Amino acid sequence: MAASVVKTPKCPRRGSVKDVAQNAPRTAPTSSKEANWNWWLLLATVFLVTFATRFYKVTEPDHICWDETHFGKMGSWYINRTFFFDVHPPLGKMLIGLSGYLTGYNGTFPFEKPGDKYNETRYQGMRYFCTTLGALIMPMGFDTVYDLTRSHEAALLAAAYLIFDVGLLTLNQYILLDPILLFFMMASVWGMVKVSKSTASGGSYGLRWWLWLFLTGTMLSCTISVKFVGLFVVLLVGLHTATELWLILGDLGQPILETVKQLACRAITLIVWPVLLYILFFYIHLSVLNRSGNGDGFYSSAFQSRLIGNSLYNASMPRDVAYGSLVTIKNHKTGGGYLHSHHHLYPKGSGARQQQVTTYTHKDENNKWLIRPHNKPGPPKGKVQILRHGDLVRLTHMATRRNLHSHNEPAPMTKKHLQVTGYGELGLGDANDVWRVLIVGGKVNETVHTVTSRLKFIHLLQNCALTSSGKQLPKWGFEQQEVSCNPNVRDKNSQWNVEDNEHKLMPSVSFSVYAPGFFARFLESHAVMLQGNAGLKPKEGEVTSRPWQWPINYRGQFFSGSSYRIYLLGNPLIWWSNLVFLALFVTVFLCNAVVQQRRAGFARSAAQNQAQVPDSETVAQDEESEHSTTDICSCCTPAKEIVPKAVPSGSPEAPNPAQSLRAAAWLFLGWMLHYLPFWAMGRVLYFHHYFPALIFNSLLTGVMYNYILRVLPKWIHHVILGLVLSILVYSFAAFSPLAYGMSGPLANEPNSTMYNLKWLSTWEF
């Protein structure tokens, strides 16, 4: 395609954005129409190939695969309006439940474990929904790269890298949060680029500009409402927006009021609007899930009082706690469990071989304790004796009839604390069973109240506080939480409250007055989610991974381990070539930065040695030095530029190499933001956590491919692209059984059809 040299309009730092739009080079209408047809043809091809590959065998296997057991179950709970606890925000699970409901699923399938057959269950609608969102990532990726490069070849290659990755295909075909998350993340980046493009072409404050701004804000809110890792794309869009505002501020052709207007518009659409949407999603979540479920115990007693069917809902219990009360005692920290015991003993090497005492987050008969005087078998018969601040008590576990006990033995997990056990027979024990009850901030003789009083239990002899350390016990403790006696009696983890209170002789009162409002529950939900997320631990036999393994495709992850096997693994040719283009970008970017810095230094040196009027060569060098790699303005161009004539009408001219490099820099930043933070995370990590970063890497590959091959004639460019696409298609066909299903011998057996594809010993398919 012929090219011509055109003079570029002034940078908006010397003239207005409108000047740039008015002075933009005019292109031939015929060529523009041809480019538009090419764009639509390629986009249609991307759509067809994407949907063909994604929906092929989407309902197979017809059994639960991997985390479908969690998110399918949660979709069922939304349909049944049953409250549950999860570490992720609610939007993705609400959409899964909604898609199931609209396609005829009734919410009764148990989703117990991977491998269970769906049988007559109408699960297909939920898979179709997740797959559809996953399939829309590729067209958006195509258009995003096209807007960044104005290159059909770059856009097509980036889309091909997304389409023909069998790992992304596998992740898109099941009832999971990941395709929903990736869709909203990609839509956020797409909107960000569209806003930048519209602003650069002088379209600010037009209808299209506003629509793209609101779309971007909506997608940002949806991304972080699916998983908290959506914060990374929020940060990316925020940095990009701040950069654009900074460049608008430096546009001397515009009054400073223009910057204020732009800032206000973006604050409304990219901050206020997403926050309101985020709150709305939680309002819907808490309104729909209004029935008691197995996740109640993760939340405070007051929170539970809003759940229909919970023992605290419209509860009528004694207001005061008395001797002889049968109570449950809940740790007052966020996500705290119930004081719990059972017949099992601590194992050898974990302190005295006495009965285990733990905290447990689920309601259970083993959570009930009887409050007794410290020096009598019980209160006087027929009389009520109120429990007060400073009283000495024994707590007897009702199911086992052993007393809450501590002694001078180290706790099993927190060695600086003392062990807490169940001790004695039928309520008879020793002096180590005596605890002093203190109300936090209480006064002498102040009454202990149900739910509202925050309590400390101080051991009389050891002077330590009953504490939930938050540490998880091993298998011998059923992975419940350790309870210990902490010498630091001021530790906030040593605060408790009485949740359930039964006493035959005391009048009951309604507790509905203590039910919290929406914002109190909204804040508590976040505290519980964040704490749960940070404390995630791998289950026994579960395959986890570390961040260094992800970019090199070191090990995959089984989605289905039955005779019909599904294995999550990236297309190695795509993943490893992505790393090559990452390295190329870093190399080119650094070299370009060095060259620009040297040119700037040369220009300054030459200017000092010139006469008062510099010659034209020095001026040209000075102008060229302005276009450094740190200038990210989407509408700045060098003094001279080669521009293809065939550009779609109404769109900005093709970016020059420096602009392409700056576009690649933003994609590289997106990759870093979605990858590097995982190195600092202490929680359990899995291979699928890398896929948001993979999308940025694949888009970067398309941009860098165009940057590197831009100097070649078009026909050579097309030949190379054809060869690359052929290799991608072939590799996809070879590795597609990983996504579509494998049967027969494993790949490490010579008679396996996958034998020659096991390139790394760590691949387990």
From Swiss-Prot:
Disulfide bonds: none annotated. It catalyses: a di-trans,poly-cis-dolichyl beta-D-mannosyl phosphate + L-seryl-[protein] = 3-O-(alpha-D-mannosyl)-L-seryl-[protein] + a di-trans,poly-cis-dolichyl phosphate + H(+); a di-trans,poly-cis-dolichyl beta-D-mannosyl phosphate + L-threonyl-[protein] = 3-O-(alpha-D-mannosyl)-L-threonyl-[protein] + a di-trans,poly-cis-dolichyl phosphate + H(+). It comes from the Eukaryota. Belongs to the glycosyltransferase 39 family. It is a multi-pass membrane protein. GO terms for cellular component: dolichyl-phosphate-mannose-protein mannosyltransferase complex; endoplasmic reticulum; endoplasmic reticulum membrane. PANTHER family: DOLICHYL-PHOSPHATE-MANNOSE--PROTEIN MANNOSYLTRANSFERASE, PROTEIN O-MANNOSYL-TRANSFERASE 2. One of its GO terms (biological process) is muscle attachment. It comes from Drosophila melanogaster (Fruit fly). GO terms for molecular function: dolichyl-phosphate-mannose-protein mannosyltransferase activity. Residues 318-374, 384-440, 445-501 form the MIR domain. Rt/POMT1 and tw/POMT2 function as a protein O-mannosyltransferase in association with each other to generate and maintain normal muscle development. This is Protein O-mannosyl-transferase 2. Glycans are attached at N80, N106, N119, N290, N314, N445, N751. Its EC number is 2.4.1.109. The chain crosses the membrane at residues 35-55, 128-148, 175-195, 206-226, 228-248, 268-288, 566-586, 667-687, 689-709, 719-739. Interacts with Rt/POMT1. InterPro entries: GlyclTrfase_39-like, Glyco_trans_39/83, MIR_dom_sf, MIR_motif, PMT_4TMC. It is found in: Endoplasmic reticulum membrane. Disruption phenotype: Death during development, the few adult escapers exhibit clockwise rotation of the abdomen. The gene is tw.
